[in-house]
């Protein structure tokens, strides 16, 4: 009996909808329970070894096979993942005369003004990661690699390259070239911003000093809480998107005690039910997070409902991340800052935005090269040294090897972010060339984006979006233009 691809797609969509609804209800503070395991149990037949094999034999699109394979690996390792989450939630750190939850340490680190106390907290985090979490993370990694081989691929890299259509090795060469090309400008662009935000340059800088650098509280005054949501709705409305009556989109601003403090997007039914969840606080970081998630929201809300599930929910996530970056980077765009927030001299924010983005890009470029070694099918023993060396050299800070397993994006999602930065740069260039520096205030730019959004995530992925936007090659070297 031939494999019923339509039935599989229908159940896959039901699963994705159920999981995103669970995510929305829990993290918006409406439900204490997070019953994700029950969702997996209801749809367990989607993720069997046989389902993955049948999809391959039926010649199903890569993103649909990718969905089945990732789900199969996740299902087979769910006990390890659950134990890891339980152990992490139970861990506490003795710091500053008190016991604090392990998961709260990152936030405390970002807001701690004393660099020595930050370093003590970071050292305690690394020690617990090494002793309590890494043994489980190593077991999880080894199990994932074994399941990958059992499915017929020699390595996780080979699996991801075949199913995503992304040449990860070539992207690794491009990002290594980016590291080399930006090496001489890195300290010049970043050090002044480090001194402004954390009071020190690269001499004496530790990893624990980077969270407050990314927090950048000195810039918060220009980003008031009362303008957070209006600045977004006004931007969208000038592009011809009437948010108040937009079909399928709910902007959830209701205060709830257990609501996530960070904005997020839940595409429950694409494009008919998409939630943008906000807890308006204000500050530069809050604006950036909201606009990032708004980019996802508008993309999902405008996707053609007739597209198959793999092109509405799955496909090349470089695409939706590019739209998210496009909106996020408005919060460091001088024309937008003047127009929407009335900032007369936006240059300090622009300079900080350029520096922080370069740190992120070099970090992910260094991480990709390491992850190619980690998931390339070879022996992983000793790779913590490679991880520490690549990150230390890229960021000019002594990076701890203890994070070599915790700081890994599943299924090379780091590559999606890297490609998204390149695609966003191309899109921004196309928008400014067609509609001017204030493209975000032009209805024609809104129509241009809605046309792109309607195509979903595929089937040609980021390359297809770039072709529709005006052509060119999705080459990571385009990011060099950001450096002036």
Question: What role is predicted for each listed range?
Answer:
Residues 282-304, 321-325:
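Active-site recognition of the HExxH zinc-binding catalytic motif
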Residues 81, 123-275, 281-284, 467, ...:
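Contiguous, non-catalytic segments that form substrate-binding/exosite surfaces or channel walls
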Residues 20, 26-31, 42-58, 155-158, ...:
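C-terminal, non-catalytic "cap/extension" segments appended to globular domains
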Residues 203-209, 261-273, 294-304, 339-346, ...:
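Active-site-adjacent bridging/hinge elements
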Residues 99-114, 143-156, 205, 392-393, ...:
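Core structural elements
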Residues 309-323, 356-359, 409-419:
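Active-site metal-coordination segments of metallo-dependent hydrolases
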Residues 1-131:
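N-terminal helix-rich structural modules
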Residues 175-185, 303, 314-352:
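Post-HExxH zinc-binding segment in Zn-dependent metallohydrolases
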């Amino acid at each position: 009996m031939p494999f019923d691809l339509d039935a599989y797609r229908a159940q896959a969509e039901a699963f994705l909808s159920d999981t995103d609804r669970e995510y929305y209800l829990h993290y918006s503070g409406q439900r204490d329970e997070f019953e994700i395991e029950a969702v997996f149990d209801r749809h367990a037949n989607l993720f069997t070894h046989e389902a993955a094999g049948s999809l391959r034999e039926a010649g199903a699109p890569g993103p649909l096979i990718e969905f089945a394979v990732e789900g199969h690996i996740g299902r087979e390792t769910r006990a390890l993942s659950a134990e890891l989450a339980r152990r992490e939630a139970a861990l506490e750190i003795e710091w500053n005369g008190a016991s604090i939850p392990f998961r709260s340490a990152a936030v405390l680190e970002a807001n701690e003004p004393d660099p020595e106390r930050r370093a003590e907290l970071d050292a305690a985090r690394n020690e617990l990661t090494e002793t309590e979490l890494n043994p489980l993370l190593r077991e999880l990694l080894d199990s994932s690699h074994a399941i990958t081989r059992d499915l017929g691929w020699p390595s996780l890299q080979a699996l991801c390259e075949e199913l995503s259509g992304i040449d990860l090795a070539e992207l690794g060469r491009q990002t290594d070239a980016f590291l080399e090309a930006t090496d001489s400008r890195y300290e010049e662009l970043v050090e002044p911003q480090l001194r402004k935000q954390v009071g020190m340059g690269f001499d004496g800088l530790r990893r624990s000093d980077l969270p407050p650098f990314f927090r950048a509280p000195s810039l918060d005054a220009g980003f008031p809480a009362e303008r957070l949501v209006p600045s977004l709705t006004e931007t969208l409305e000038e592009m011809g998107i009437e948010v108040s009556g937009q079909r399928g989109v709910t902007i959830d601003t209701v205060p709830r005690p257990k609501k996530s403090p960070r904005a997020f997007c839940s595409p429950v039914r694409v494009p008919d039910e998409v939630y943008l969840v906000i807890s308006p606080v204000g500050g530069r970081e809050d604006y950036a997070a909201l606009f990032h998630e708004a980019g996802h929201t508008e993309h999902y809300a405008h996707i053609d409902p007739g597209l198959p599930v793999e092109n509405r929910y799955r496909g090349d996530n470089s695409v939706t991340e590019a739209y998210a970056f496009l909106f996020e980077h408005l919060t460091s765009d001088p024309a937008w800052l003047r127009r929407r927030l009335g900032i007369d001299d936006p240059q300090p924010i622009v300079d900080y935005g350029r520096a922080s983005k370069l740190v992120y890009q070099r970090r992910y470029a260094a991480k990709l090269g390491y992850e190619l070694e980690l998931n390339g099918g070879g022996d992983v023993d000793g790779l913590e040294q490679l991880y520490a060396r690549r990150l230390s050299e890229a960021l000019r800070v002594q990076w701890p090897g203890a994070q070599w397993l915790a700081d890994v994006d599943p299924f090379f999602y780091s590559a999606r972010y890297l490609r998204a930065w390149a695609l966003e740069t191309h899109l921004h260039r196309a928008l400014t060339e067609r509609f001017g520096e204030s493209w975000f205030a032009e209805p024609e730019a809104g129509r241009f984006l809605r046309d792109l959004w309607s195509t979903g995530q595929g089937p040609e992925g980021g390359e297809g979006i770039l072709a529709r936007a005006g052509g060119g090659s999705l080459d990571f070297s385009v990011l060099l233009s950001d450096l002036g």
